[in-house]
From Swiss-Prot:
The gene is cysS. InterPro entries: Cys-tRNA-ligase, Cys-tRNA-synt_Ia_DALR, Cys-tRNA/MSH_ligase, CysS_C, Rossmann-like_a/b/a_fold, tRNA-synt_1_cat_dom, tRNAsynth_Ia_anticodon-bd. Keywords: Aminoacyl-tRNA synthetase, ATP-binding, Cytoplasm, Ligase, Metal-binding, Nucleotide-binding, Protein biosynthesis, Zinc. Its EC number is 6.1.1.16. It catalyses: tRNA(Cys) + L-cysteine + ATP = L-cysteinyl-tRNA(Cys) + AMP + diphosphate. It comes from the Bacteria. The lineage of its organism: Bacteria, Bacillati, Bacillota, Clostridia, Thermoanaerobacterales. This is Cysteine--tRNA ligase. Transmembrane segments: none annotated.
Length: 478
């Protein structure tokens, strides 16, 4: 298995710290709002990476934190007029609603900053004792110039960093490059007692303390979005290795940005999309499929056309799965109309291609392509054989489930895909469906075939297939 390591700037063969086990720490959200599409990409990417290690037979210890002590939380709580910890707890709960919708599995541990203040204070004390941090007016700062190798993750020199560094009003740090490990208490902000007075931790030290507590030094993989490379992850390395004298994490994995019609997603442009909003517009399976549709290190551009394509793609997968299950459930004698052995041979090739794609730095775009090749092979086989081999079909279904256990497109129970039951998919009510069918019939009678086709195609994208028969219009789920 090859993994691109941001630290070295190249692909490396993965070799775990402990044979047969993988330790992963992923920076989770700051809980001051609902998660947006950029947050979701990181969640889905690293959930998929974890799933693939499990598929390969590894035992995985997966940690994803919640930053529930932060300036953004304090500012948002003032706007809403509630306590910062109440606000943070609210958005932790909301995170799980969105994560569940995207079929993101729970981490083994979801540590919160507020529950780990003693560990944070102990780590800061170690850094001070090693001469790499200093106290100034109740604040504690990391002395960047005293740590050799600072900048090696982000590939930045101290001179480059100094050009963009600044000292905020009220800060007492000795060097513009230094960063806060502990911040003295201010009126109206949460605080904890410490050897340096009342205060709260800086952002970067929080993740170091939690990662070291649950995974120890030299753990396997540290992940997050590319926006965290500097300063967050650079500072994590400095303070963690400064405290322990040992390597912090061995492989650093960063997912690329989400763009909106090739523009950066930002509040100022008004193009920040919340997962909660998008899952009301599109099936969550389609959103997850979209988030895995490009290599994780590359930018991923969002637009409605791309999402509609993902909806159609998910429906193709559902149709194939339905045909497989229907064929296996049908009370018919087993047969082989001349293709079962060939299909089984193709399945082996497809499994090899899928694993090769994921082994090559978790290339989910290629892995998805293999999954769609599987649907093509199954559809072709069923079309060409009146008496298909049940053994071959069962192997195809098993492979479909195996691919899904990695990509996580559909929810699963005991390793098998679970599709939601119901007369009509999504938020489409029976009454609305009847109305759309009636409008399409009116359009056809008026020879407005463009409108009729648009309604038909729109319903197909929502998982409803219309059939025109002499007895009238019939519909079925795809």
């Amino acid at each position: 298995m090859q993994i691109f390591n941001t630290l070295t700037g190249r692909k490396e063969t993965f070799c775990p710290r402990d044979p047969g086990r993988v330790s992963i720490y992923v920076c989770g959200p700051t809980t001051y709002n609902f998660i947006h599409l950029g947050n979701a990409r990181a969640l889905v990417v690293f959930d998929t990476i974890r799933r693939y290690f499990l598929y390969k037979g590894y035992r995985v210890l997966y940690i994803q934190n919640f930053t529930d002590v932060d300036d953004k939380i304090i500012n948002r709580s003032r706007e809403e007029g509630i306590d910062p910890q109440t606000l943070a707890a609210k958005y932790v709960d909301e995170y799980f609603v969105d994560a569940d919708a995207l079929n993101v599995r729970r981490a083994d541990v979801h540590p919160k900053v507020s529950d780990h203040i003693p560990e944070i204070i102990a780590l800061i004390t170690m850094i001070i004792d090693r001469g790499l941090a200093y106290v100034a007016g109740g604040d504690v700062y990391f002395a960047v110039r005293k740590f050799g190798g600072y900048g090696r993750l982000s590939k930045r020199s101290l001179d480059d960093l100094l050009a963009g560094a600044r000292v905020e009003v009220g800060e007492q740090k000795r060097d513009p490059l230094d960063f806060a490990l502990w911040k003295a208490a201010k009126p109206g902000e949460p605080w904890w007692e410490s050897p340096w007075g009342r205060g709260r931790p800086g952002w970067h030290i929080e993740c170091s303390a939690m990662a070291l507590k649950y995974l120890g030094t030299g753990f396997d993989i540290h992940g997050g979005g590319a926006d965290l490379i500097f300063p967050h992850h650079e500072n994590e390395i400095a303070q963690s290795e400064g405290a322990t004298g040992e390597p912090f994490a061995r492989y650093w994995i960063h997912n690329g940005f989400i763009t909106i019609r090739e523009e950066k997603m930002s509040k100022s442009l008004g193009n920040v999309f919340l997962v909660r909003e998008l899952t009301r517009l599109y099936p969550p399976e389609a959103l997850r499929l979209f988030l895995l549709s490009n290599h994780y290190r590359n930018p991923l551009d969002y637009d409605p056309e791309a999402m509609e394509a993902s909806v159609r793609a998910v429906n193709r997968l559902k149709t194939c799965l339905g045909l497989l299950r229907e064929s296996l459930d049908r009370p018919a004698p087993d047969g082989d109309g001349g293709g079962g052995n060939r299909l089984e041979a193709v399945l082996e090739v497809l499994q090899g291609r899928f694993e090769a794609a994921m082994d090559d730095d978790f290339n989910t775009a290629l892995a998805q392509a293999v999954m769609f090749d599987l649907t093509h092979e199954v559809n072709t086989y069923l079309h060409q054989n009146d008496r298909p081999s049940r053994g071959a079909l069962q192997k195809a279904l098993d492979l479909f489930d195996a691919f899904n256990r990695v990509l996580g497109i559909f929810p699963e129970h005991k390793g098998r895909i679970v599709l939601e039951a119901g007369a009509v998919s999504g938020d489409l009510s029976q009454g609305l469906l009847d109305l759309l069918i009636a409008l399409r019939q009116d359009a056809r009678r008026n020879k407005d075939f463009a409108t009729a086709d648009r309604i038909r195609d729109g319903l197909r994208a929502l998982g409803i297939l219309l059939e025109d028969t002499p007895q009238g219009v019939r519909w079925k789920k795809t």
